[in-house]
């Protein structure tokens, strides 16, 4: 039986490519996106495939997935400083409440979870690209 993976932010740039990769590797993929910044055009080629299902859902609301679940890849989040200014509350909620909901789902399903971050945590970096040990150049008071 194929492993099942939930990919949040599935209609975004990274999420859609992850859906493609996991399907190509024989996984049963459950894509989830609220489509605030994601676009169905990124995953429409997957509709109708036996090993793909899409849930139009906001992870800041309770998340229920029936059956077994092996992995959760949490990539849901507005991904641009422009979006952060336009929808600041939603951005904060998906990173906090959305992560909380998905951690609860991972616990319920005994699934492994990967939570994506963003280069924005480095602030305005002094070096490019940033290595894993780069401390960042973040102004803690804004």
PLM regions and their residue ranges:
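N-terminal Rossmann-like NAD(P)+-binding domain of SDR-like oxidoreductases, especially those catalyzing
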Residues: 1-142
């Amino acid at each position: 039986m194929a492993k099942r993976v939930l990919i949040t932010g599935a209609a975004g740039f990274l999420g859609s490519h992850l859906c493609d990769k996991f399907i190509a590797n024989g996984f049963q993929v459950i894509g989830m996106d609220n489509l605030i910044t994601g676009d169905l055009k990124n995953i429409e080629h997957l509709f109708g495939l036996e090993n793909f299902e899409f849930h139009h859902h906001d992870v800041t609301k309770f998340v229920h997935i029936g059956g077994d679940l092996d992995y959760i890849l949490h990539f849901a989040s507005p991904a641009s400083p422009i979006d952060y200014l336009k929808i600041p509350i939603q951005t904060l909620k998906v990173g906090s409440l959305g992560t909380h909901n998905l951690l609860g789902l991972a616990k319920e399903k005994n699934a492994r979870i990967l939570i994506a971050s963003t280069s924005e945590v480095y602030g305005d970096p002094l070096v490019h690209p940033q290595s894993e040990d780069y401390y960042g150049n973040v102004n803690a008071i804004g």
